[in-house]
């Protein structure tokens, strides 16, 4: 399972980089995005399962949150159906559980003698908890009005995919150094790919928000395959 996890992770990083910088909605973006989705779902699920076996609660939270973000990001640009609405409802409950659990573990880490819990400092737990709870509020908005306008759905797709890629990128570049090639270990450049994901995410979110005000409603329809 570890080999599958590693291979899926590397595939996700490469496909995610292509999808992140490709023109959104274009053929390259769609194809690399689908590869990214499947690779991330495999990587996050195998990572969570291995973490359950090894009783690593922090990685379980990261794996479940990543799986949730990718799945709901994919559904955000699909044609709304009752089946997808049910999946979103279950995912919303999972995100709420992850968020509350992460915040609780963060408080436990604050009170611990070492200042960490399972080797993870409080800010990491609080970050996961905050993201999960914010995503839950977004799910509630979708649940209340399933046919939310396309601009909202596109931004929902963007930030969730990008944050899932952020988690994967941070895990690879800022995690245990033995994962990296020798020339990158100890390099001060390691945080750069992680920060770039956030920079590009905010760029695309800003671009969508600015264009949303002046484009016709047809522009906001779900992204569809054209070839």
Would you name each region that the model predicts?
Residues 1-227:
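Alpha-helical membrane insertion/targeting regions
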């Amino acid at each position: 399972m570890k080999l599958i996890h590693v291979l899926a992770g590397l595939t996700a990083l490469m496909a995610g980089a292509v999808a992140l910088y490709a023109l959104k909605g274009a053929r390259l973006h769609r194809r690399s995005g689908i590869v990214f989705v499947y690779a991330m779902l495999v990587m996050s699920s195998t990572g969570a399962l291995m973490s359950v076996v090894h009783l690593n609660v922090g990685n379980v939270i990261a794996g479940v949150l990543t799986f949730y973000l990718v799945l709901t990001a994919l559904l955000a640009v699909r044609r709304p159906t009752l089946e997808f609405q049910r999946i979103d409802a279950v995912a919303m409950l999972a995100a709420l559980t992850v968020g509350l659990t992460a915040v609780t573990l963060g408080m436990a880490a604050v009170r611990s003698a070492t200042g960490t819990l399972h080797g993870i400092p409080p800010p990491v737990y609080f970050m996961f908890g905050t993201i999960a709870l914010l995503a839950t509020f977004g799910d509630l908005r979708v649940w209340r009005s399933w046919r939310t306008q396309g601009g909202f759905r596109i931004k929902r797709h963007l930030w969730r995919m990008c944050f899932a890629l952020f988690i994967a990128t941070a895990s690879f570049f800022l995690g245990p150094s033995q994962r990296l090639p020798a020339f990158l270990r100890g390099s001060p450049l390691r945080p750069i790919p992680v920060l770039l994901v956030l920079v590009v995410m905010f760029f695309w979110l800003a671009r969508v928000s600015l264009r949303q005000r002046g484009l016709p409603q047809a522009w906001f329809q779900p992204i569809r395959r054209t070839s």
